[in-house]
């Protein structure tokens, strides 16, 4: 597709696709606006993690009720709670003490690596750090809610063929 020109805008803000003249957006969210079409692409699993040096001077965290005693780094869309569950327990909101927020997951990742506190981050972003023990998983027996990465667009009726082909390409690529 050498004739296709990309204009890529990277933001974690929810923009009006029509007003911003965006053909397709990729969003990680539990739900999109009813006025948009969302094509689910994959599930995004998040984990709680922290730098080992941040945790070493603190009491061992064994239950989410303790999160309020720790510095927490969170996405700006989160309230003052994190929702966690186990196999035996329904999702429950636990209060957290927010010391830093960002609308960018990579910025949150760097804050976590810089020993600023505990963060809830997509596993795909922290996988290498967890394997290398640069970061360690916290409360590993608890799960964060699954989010969905979706291709989001305004209407099938007016979706340009090149956009349809691009979405099909992304879907095919993610299957590999």
Briefly describe each language-model feature range.
Residues 7-11, 85, 138, 152:
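Solvent-exposed beta-strand sheet faces enriched in polar/charged residues
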Residues 1-34:
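Central regulatory/effector-binding core of bacterial HTH transcription factors
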Residues 26, 109, 127, 153, ...:
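A cross-family signal for key residues in well-ordered alpha-helices
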Residues 27, 39, 109, 156-157, ...:
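Basic side chains
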């Amino acid at each position: 597709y050498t004739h296709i020109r990309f204009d890529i805008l990277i933001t974690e803000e929810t923009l009006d696709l029509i007003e911003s003249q965006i053909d397709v957006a990729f969003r990680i969210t539990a739900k999109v606006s009813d006025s948009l079409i969302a094509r689910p692409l994959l599930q995004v699993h998040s984990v709680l993690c922290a730098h080992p040096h941040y945790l070493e001077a603190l009491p061992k965290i064994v239950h989410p009720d303790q999160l309020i005693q720790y510095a927490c780094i969170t996405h700006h869309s989160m309230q003052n709670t994190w929702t966690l569950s186990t196999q035996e327990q329904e999702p429950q909101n636990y209060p957290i003490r927010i010391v830093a927020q960002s609308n960018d997951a990579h910025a949150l990742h760097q804050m976590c690596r810089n020993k600023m506190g505990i963060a809830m981050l997509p596993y795909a972003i922290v996988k290498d750090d967890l394997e290398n023990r640069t970061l360690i998983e916290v409360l590993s027996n608890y799960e964060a809610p699954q989010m969905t990465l979706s291709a989001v667009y305004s209407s099938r009726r007016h979706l340009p063929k090149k956009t349809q082909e691009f979405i099909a390409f992304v879907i095919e690529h993610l299957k590999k």
